[in-house]
């Protein structure tokens, strides 16, 4: 089969012809139909410090996909041959203290598909059956391919109370953009998006942002404060400046959820912007298993969230270099590879 792999500890990836994967007991074989490129895949492509610490090539990359189940080896009946599925990319241990506290998303021994084990940028993938999520027919294949990162957006919004609130999303990359219709669907009355890119702000507006602010041209703190302040801030950028601006915007007693990962340590005015204002801050990782998936699939299958608006580029599987270029250009939403029919 064809697979896009990190063949060696250098920049770039390549397509290889490799054997189809074996299917251990309790695992399933899935034919990959569509797969989307994540920021993690870009890190691996660029072979930055994050990927060098976590990956030992050769590994087939990719962890966001939709596919068809071809075989289940002594499974539980969770999925059947022929089912259309997406998948949770974190393979958990079930025995660490986090798993035993029903916090599987924070498993201390997590292995990530496409990082620690062969992933989904291949014609076929072997994956634990328990990680598969059966999709109803009302979920388009394109949407199915981005449900995993959509889950990050859902988890972030779920972690705070947006009902009847003014919500600011700082950083509207693909996951920040996806958080906007989720917040809208869960009851936010006004959503403000901030970013450096007019392209991304246009995408944010298209999916439901009421106000968009290019922080290179306008003062987001002043604008939001003039509107009455932010009840909730979703920090999706990883920018120290955006994080501090978000804290300045929040009204006393407000909430912030942080999904964006800064490259380095950050400096905050805790005394004035957090403690004195009584702000609650939550760090977000992964997706809660399985509440996040249940809500995410429901939002898409019911039509409350249209993920096709977030998918801006699609490429043939063999045109993966062009797909990575589009993803790294900064002028894209989600980029999808059409792997097979």
Language-model-detected regions and their locations in the chain:
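Glycine-rich cofactor phosphate-binding loops and adjacent beta1-alpha1 units
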Residues: 160-163, 202-280, 321
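Rossmann-fold dehydrogenase core element
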Residues: 255, 269-309
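NAD(P)H dinucleotide-binding glycine-rich loop of Rossmann-like/cofactor-binding domains
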Residues: 93-170
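Mid-domain Rossmann-like dinucleotide-binding core that forms the NAD(H)/NADP(H) cofactor-binding site
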Residues: 139-217, 222
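C-terminal hydrophobic helical "lid"/dimerization subdomain
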Residues: 1, 240, 244-248, 290-341
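Glycine-rich beta-strand-centered segment in the early N-terminal region that forms part
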Residues: 21-35, 50-97, 136-138
